């Protein structure tokens, strides 16, 4: 029988000691990486549903906000002529940009040296609205939003959210049918607007939405409108 040297025995002991530690570290890295990916993918109020993006879902009959059922319009909204007129005649330019003042709970739609619109909003109460300089990366006439935790009073399931414009991951500007408490924080991170205000903004921003379209992304000749959010 071959005897192991003292040096070999010590090496084996060191390996056995370090192996569990390496497994723990690897597991931890995988766990936190997965959580980071999931949190980034699901942050904000929701994410566009690729299969039904922009479409009105007639089969959705129930809406829930903070654990309570709410009523909502169960018919597709028809854009007002004035909103569509702005799409055709008033193509968005680099002079148009959106300012959101979280301390005032107000949105300002700047057009050069003037302000086209000033709206009350509701920003994040149960989760903060991100601050910074962003660009609209997708616009959807309707989308579904779901989040929070069931049984804690934070769960929400909101189908057919109208006039949604995502500006950062799952954070967006959108119409609101589940409350009318604008001017006060009421969201899970998104920027809530009264639906008529959200509609005007939807057709004012870039990329322009042609009549009949329900979803659009920015492209080279028609980039997303700039969105600046500050306290």
Q: How does the language model describe each region?
A:
Residues 36-93:
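N-terminal, intrinsically disordered, polar/charged segments of Gram-positive cell-envelope systems
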């Amino acid at each position: 029988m071959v005897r192991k040297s003292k040096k070999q025995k010590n090496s084996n002991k060191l390996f056995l000691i370090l192996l569990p530690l390496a497994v723990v570290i690897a597991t931890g890295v995988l766990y936190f990486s997965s959580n980071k990916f999931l949190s980034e993918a699901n942050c904000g109020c929701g994410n566009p549903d690729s299969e039904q993006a922009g479409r009105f879902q007639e089969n959705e009959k129930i809406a829930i906000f903070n654990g309570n059922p709410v009523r909502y319009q169960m018919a597709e909204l028809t854009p007002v002529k004035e909103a569509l007129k702005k799409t055709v005649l008033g193509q968005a330019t680099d002079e148009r940009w959106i300012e959101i003042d979280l301390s005032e709970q107000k949105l300002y739609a700047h057009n050069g040296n003037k302000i086209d619109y000033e709206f009350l909003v509701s920003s994040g109460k149960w989760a903060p609205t991100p601050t910074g300089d962003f660009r609209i990366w997708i616009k959807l006439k309707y989308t579904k939003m779901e989040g929070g935790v069931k049984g804690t009073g934070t769960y929400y399931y909101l189908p057919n959210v109208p006039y949604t414009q995502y500006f950062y991951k799952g954070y967006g500007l959108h119409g609101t049918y589940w409350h009318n408490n604008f001017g006060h924080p009421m969201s899970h991170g998104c920027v809530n607007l009264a639906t008529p205000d959200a509609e005007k903004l939807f057709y004012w921003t870039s990329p322009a939405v042609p009549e009949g379209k329900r979803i659009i992304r920015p492209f080279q000749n028609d980039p997303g409108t700039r969105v600046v959010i500050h306290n």
